[in-house]
């Protein structure tokens, strides 16, 4: 544990030393600083897991991911490092998924947590554009590039949740509200309200889009269809058609958002999600309705 902790501290101090040299002399390339900060954020996770092992805490405990995320996010905002922010958001998303899956007894609460995390990502992203970007009079502000990781992770979680919500076999049976779900929903409500009140213009459309996607997902889960795979009725037709149309619209919105924000990752993620979703729907849902090559072509 001591060796890992010393390595983490050395990486953290070394990264900021390199950042200081670059700021004053311009001799250290920025990728080196970013890589060093990323190594420090990864090493912090190693410290946590090593400490957990020493204390006989199971390595698969989701709280370790949550602590890792908090530490990486703290480093990112203290030292304005993009690499720690990406690591913090990825581990935070993994914590939301792992912790809800471990504690939930139903599908609806898991999807609600993922949709709420997507709303948080979209809301925090536009708040970065509104207040904390660098510019005249704010040379020490948080870089506007911090908005892109929040938007990307939030959009990814929204697409994953909507993908799962479109599966007819997922229902609201045994629905229970846990303390963790309440906390995530409250945080999402606060971030959403702050984005609507404080942001201006088209920035407001991003959290609204995430909210609309969440509401669509709830409708798909609560809509009971696909109970009998051998008999396809009007409800199954309607559910499948609504799911495909909704996913196309949401994925298209995220792809367009990637163009408007000049963030290629969003467009790539939305395109890949749409292809995977269409393929899955073709063979898992629509196979009982339309057969042959026309199935995929139509979708």
What are these regions, as identified by a protein language model?
Residues 1-299:
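Alpha-helical multi-pass membrane segments and their bilayer interfacial helix-loop junctions
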């Amino acid at each position: 544990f001591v060796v890992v902790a010393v390595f983490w501290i050395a990486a953290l101090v070394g990264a900021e030393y390199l950042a200081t040299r670059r700021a004053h002399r311009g001799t250290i390339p920025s990728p080196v600083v970013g890589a060093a900060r990323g190594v420090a954020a990864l090493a912090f996770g190693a410290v946590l897991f090593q400490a957990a092992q020493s204390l006989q805490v199971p390595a698969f405990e989701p709280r370790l991911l949550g602590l890792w995320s908090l530490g990486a996010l703290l480093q990112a905002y203290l030292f304005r490092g993009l690499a720690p922010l990406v690591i913090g958001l990825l581990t935070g998303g993994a914590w939301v998924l792992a912790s809800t899956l471990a504690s939930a007894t139903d599908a609806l609460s898991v999807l609600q947590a993922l949709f709420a995390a997507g709303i948080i990502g979209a809301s925090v992203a536009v708040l970065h554009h509104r207040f904390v970007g660098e510019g005249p009079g704010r040379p020490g502000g948080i870089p506007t590039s911090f908005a892109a990781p929040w938007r990307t992770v939030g959009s990814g979680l929204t697409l994953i949740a909507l993908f799962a919500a479109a599966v007819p076999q997922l229902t609201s049976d045994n629905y229970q509200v846990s303390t963790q779900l309440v906390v995530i929903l409250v945080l999402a409500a606060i971030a959403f309200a702050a984005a609507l009140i404080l942001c201006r213009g088209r920035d407001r459309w991003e959290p609204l889009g995430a909210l609309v996607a969440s509401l669509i997902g709830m409708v798909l889960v609560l809509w009971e269809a696909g109970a009998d795979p051998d008999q396809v009725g009007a409800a199954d037709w309607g559910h499948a058609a609504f799911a495909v149309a909704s996913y196309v619209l949401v994925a298209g919105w995220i792809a367009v958002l990637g163009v408007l924000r000049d963030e290629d990752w969003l467009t790539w993620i939305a395109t890949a999600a749409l292809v995977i979703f269409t393929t899955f729907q073709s063979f898992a849902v629509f196979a009982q309705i339309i057969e042959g090559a026309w199935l995929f072509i139509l979708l």
